[in-house]
A protein has these predicted regions:
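C-terminal effector modules of nucleic-acid-centric enzymes and ribosome-associated factors
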Residues: 10, 18-30, 155-158, 168-223
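Accessory interdomain/linker segments of ATP-dependent helicases and helicase-like nucleic-acid enzymes
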Residues: 23-104
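Short nucleic-acid-contacting surface segments enriched for D/E, G, S/T with interspersed K/R
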Residues: 129-145
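Short, structured beta-strand/loop micro-motifs enriched in basic residues and often containing a Trp
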Residues: 119-127
Length: 223
């Protein structure tokens, strides 16, 4: 749903710094990455490699591990920042480390500009986005990472889309969880787990799955 477009140099630098770090993470053999993934999936659910969500789930995990992991050595992004001598790359790393995951409703967007309303925190953002969001309609709900860099808010690398038409049900669920005192991170994990459920129960209306979040469903019948 997202295609690459030629952006400004700030966009290129921001994403290149993250891609370089993700590439380094792929060479990790300490067991830290595997342990972090297990913890991540305990919170959000385990996706199988043959499922459609495998790629966005994995990319979202890498972003979380790189910039939010609280292991003994701290987040890999923080470790990279400590050794970075280039001031522009260091600024980009700091922006990633200050970024936050968000569950947003997409507004009516124009080329390069995407309005996004954060359901968990209530904030409204005007996001600078050079990539084309094919098939994304106003009112769609997406989990994204919001990054403030060089005076602009930008999306991260990963987009986890929720089914079209589920926005009202998701907002109801988010309000219910906020009323229970749940944190934004807890709400994000919960709603992501519901998104995974829509893949496992394709014979069930997604709206029902979001509205009946605590309802026990039978095993998928393949229908």
């Amino acid at each position: 749903m997202v295609t690459t477009a030629e952006g400004d140099p700030d966009d290129a630098l921001l994403y290149r710094v993250a891609d370089d770090l993700f590439h380094q993470l792929g060479d990790d053999d300490s067991g830290e990455l595997a342990g972090a993934r297990e913890r991540y999936e305990e919170r959000r659910g385990r996706v199988r490699q043959d499922e459609e969500l495998w790629e966005p789930w994995t990319q979202a995990f890498l972003e979380w591990f790189a910039f939010e992991w609280e292991g003994a050595g701290g987040a890999p992004g923080a470790r990279a920042l400590a050794g970075e001598t280039d001031p522009r790359r260091a600024a980009a790393l700091r922006a990633w480390l200050r970024s936050q995951r968000a569950l947003v409703v997409i507004g009516r967007h124009q080329p390069g500009r995407v309005p996004a309303r954060d359901l968990c925190r209530g904030a409204q953002f005007e996001v600078s986005e050079p990539r084309s969001l094919h098939g994304v309609e106003p009112g769609d709900v997406v989990e994204v990472r919001l990054i403030g860099f060089e005076g602009q808010v930008r999306f991260g690398r990963t987009f986890l889309y929720h089914p079209t038409g589920t926005a009202a049900a998701i907002e109801e669920r988010v309000e219910q969880l906020r009323g229970q005192g749940r944190t934004a991170e807890e709400i994000l994990d919960h709603v992501a787990a519901l998104r995974l459920r829509t893949e496992r129960y394709r014979h069930v209306d997604p709206v029902r799955l979001y509205r009946a979040a605590t309802e026990e469903l039978g095993e998928p019948d393949g229908g």
